[in-house]
């Protein structure tokens, strides 16, 4: 496959109506972005695909009863209205249900799907039990771990298959009792794939971090690198519980700017404006933003804590750092690369990313085909008894 011949429609059409039910709003976090991108990626290959999830409209959350997420006021916990959810499932008449988030939203959806005899695929993206230690201590951390462990185990018991996007996450799913745990890849926003690719940068001068401003992302390593590399310019794009702290730090660093939340429509432009993307995370089940930068022919530096480094076909297009404390040192080394070295690495990164996207599409279509009800009109009618 050559880069110029890459096609977004190489996989055949299959019979199926796929319904994704998630409490992650589209593009508000990694999981929300994953399934919005997956819908676009599969829409030409299945009969129908739709997502039921909360939405942020005019800065107001809609789609259920919303509670603030402890430790992060930019995210919400959503409690679904079971009767509304039941009606939406009935109206769509799915042949397979995909549930990517634990908690009450996912559990209610799984129970409704199970009662109707619909096959369920669980997307296991985040090990919240590990994140709990970064946000809370003592009793609150213990309660959070217990809740998510219970929730994940309950979802796994109700599902036919569990998919995770790294070997580590597959192993964790196995330990928690998930049936048929398997590996999935990562789709990308179609704009990243079809927008004309700008030339590979001739040198490394402009550095980008893009993601949630949260403890697990280790954003302070980017601030420290900006202080240590005055000849480079740094941009931090995103929102999260650490935004105020990051903005305070950036106010005294001349070569660092903080953009805040960036609309999804600007992602291609933002990546193309920079030479290198950095992701120094302490916990990262995959790291989709790294794949996004790879497909735009940009240099990508990631920590070895990112799940993307477990993919041999992708590490050929990455530069992996074992310690975020040496981020500035590694950036300085990359700034000394020749134009040829940079071109070779960045074009290889794009080729790796394109192959991965195509492989992931085939995998998802295979899973949908495997668990598909052959006759959508035969789907049972969902009923919920009022008590």
Regions found by a protein language model. Give the residues of each.
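A conserved mid-protein helix/loop that constitutes part of the nucleotide-sugar donor-binding site
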Residues: 32-33, 205, 209-228, 241-245
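Aromatic "clamp/platform" in nucleotide-sugar-dependent glycosyltransferases that forms part
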Residues: 102, 282
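Donor nucleotide-sugar binding/catalytic pocket of nucleotide-sugar-dependent glycosyltransferases
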Residues: 144-196
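Short alpha-helical donor nucleotide-sugar binding micro-motif in glycosyltransferases
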Residues: 156, 261-262, 269-274
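Nucleotide-activated donor-binding/catalytic signature segment of Leloir-type glycosyltransferases, i.e.
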Residues: 245-265
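Short hydrophobic beta-strand element within catalytic cores of glycosyltransferases
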Residues: 299-302
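A charged, aromatic-enriched C-terminal amphipathic alpha-helix characteristic of glycosyltransferases
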Residues: 339-373
């Amino acid at each position: 496959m050559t880069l110029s011949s890459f096609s977004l429609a190489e996989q055949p059409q299959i019979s199926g109506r796929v319904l994704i039910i998630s409490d992650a709003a589209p593009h508000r976090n990694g999981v929300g972005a994953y399934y919005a991108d997956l819908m676009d990626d599969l829409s030409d290959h299945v009969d129908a695909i739709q997502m039921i999830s909360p939405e942020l409209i005019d800065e107001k959350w809609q789609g259920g009863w919303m509670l603030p997420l402890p430790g992060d006021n930019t995210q919400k916990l959503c409690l679904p209205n079971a009767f509304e959810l039941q009606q939406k499932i009935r109206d769509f008449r799915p042949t397979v249900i995909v549930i990517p988030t634990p908690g009450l939203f996912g559990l209610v959806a799984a129970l409704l799907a199970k009662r109707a005899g619909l096959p369920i695929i669980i997307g296991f993206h985040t090990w919240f039990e590990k994140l709990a230690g970064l946000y809370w201590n003592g009793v609150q951390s213990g309660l959070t771990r217990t809740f998510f462990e219970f929730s994940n185990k309950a979802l796994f018991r109700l599902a036919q298959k569990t998919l995770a996007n790294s070997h580590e996450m597959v192993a964790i799913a196995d330990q928690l009792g998930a049936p048929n745990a398997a590996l999935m890849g990562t789709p990308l926003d179609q704009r990243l794939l079809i927008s004309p690719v700008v030339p590979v940068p001739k040198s490394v001068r402009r550095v980008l971090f893009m993601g949630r401003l949260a403890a697990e992302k280790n954003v302070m390593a980017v601030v420290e690198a900006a202080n240590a590399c005055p000849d480079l310019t740094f941009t931090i794009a995103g929102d999260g519980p650490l935004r105020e702290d990051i903005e305070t730090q950036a106010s005294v660093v001349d070569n660092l700017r903080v953009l805040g939340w960036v609309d999804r429509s600007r992602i291609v432009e933002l990546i193309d404006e920079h030479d290198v993307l950095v992701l120094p995370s302490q916990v990262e089940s995959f790291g989709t933003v790294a794949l996004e930068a790879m497909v735009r022919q940009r240099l990508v530096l990631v920590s070895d804590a990112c799940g993307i480094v477990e993919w041999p076909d992708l590490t050929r297009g990455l530069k992996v750092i074992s310690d975020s404390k040496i981020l500035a040192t590694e950036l300085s080394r990359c700034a000394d690369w020749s134009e040829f070295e940079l071109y070779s690495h960045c074009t290889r990164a794009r080729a790796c990313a394109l192959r991965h996207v195509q492989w992931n599409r085939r995998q998802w279509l295979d899973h949908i085909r495997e668990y598909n009800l052959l006759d959508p009109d035969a789907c049972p009618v969902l009923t919920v008894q009022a008590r």
